[in-house]
């Protein structure tokens, strides 16, 4: 079987939405070539465990690659992808060069091309993310292992926005807490909360592809008894009192439900937000404060920001 490798040269800000667009279009495997990963390995104790090849990374910007089957619908699929990516401009997302190229690869090349980019990654004091095909032995007795399949939708959990969220969850989720995960994507934040001994985790996403992906990942990590995922538009129709709400989505989306998040939290509960590009930090911070929150901490990694707020 023949596969097309779709390569998109873009910005850090656009990586996650473009990756999601590619998965929704039917991509089987997505690769992110980010030169900052090379710097991270040298500077950050939580960097890649394995050596990275600088020749695989661009000099500037980020390259997102996706693999699509060659069929009679390919041209139509690619046109749809281009149109949807261009629509991100409506959300003031910088697409950078937005240069798209297409090349053909065979079955064997496709099967191994994207796997070389993924290895076990320690992203916090407790959590290590491991691709499903890797054999990995925990280094510490209290290490928590999240298994992810990068061939499935919505990435592997090593993007800075996800790392910031998991590090925050590790600090603020207590045993017995009730947690909401808004815009769950892969479900990785719900998995982390469940492994941190939350009593219950309710994950929501409007996209049915994300819901199915999250459901599979919850099952893979054996936390389906604690965490459940449902299709829902943000926090619409959700009731009850919760200890932690986490949302790793675009800043523009977070702005839509800050008041709802406040009303659903117990007194003293925390709202962990991420997916916020640096220049939108102040806008989100002000919206949280206007909703009644107190800002506890603002964390940053590369171009991204996570804001932790308390009711």
From Swiss-Prot:
Subcellular localization, as worded in the UniProt entry: Cytoplasm
Coiled-coil residues are: none
Identify the PANTHER family for this entry. Answer: ELECTRON TRANSFER FLAVOPROTEIN BETA SUBUNIT LYSINE METHYLTRANSFERASE
Organismal lineage: Bacteria, Bacillati, Bacillota, Bacilli, Bacillales
GO molecular function (one) = protein methyltransferase activity
Protein family (similarity comment):
Belongs to the methyltransferase superfamily. PrmA family.
Predominant localisation class: cytoplasm
Annotated residues that bind S-adenosyl-L-methionine are located at: 162, 183, 205, 248
User: Pfam families in the record, alphabetically?
Assistant: PrmA (PF06325)
Which GO biological-process labels does this protein carry? Answer: methylation
Give the signal peptide as a residue range, or say none if absent. none
Keywords linked to the UniProt accession: Cytoplasm, Methyltransferase, S-adenosyl-L-methionine, Transferase
Function (record text): Methylates ribosomal protein L11.
* Enzyme class, UniProt record, top EC level: transferase
| Reaction(s) catalysed by this chain's protein | L-lysyl-[protein] + 3 S-adenosyl-L-methionine = N(6),N(6),N(6)-trimethyl-L-lysyl-[protein] + 3 S-adenosyl-L-homocysteine + 3 H(+)
HAMAP family in alphabetical order: Methyltr_PrmA
What species is given as this protein's source?
Bacillus subtilis (strain 168)
Question: What is the protein's given name?
Answer: Ribosomal protein L11 methyltransferase
- Highest taxon of source: Bacteria
Please state the Enzyme Commission number of this protein. 2.1.1.-
GO CC terms: cytoplasm
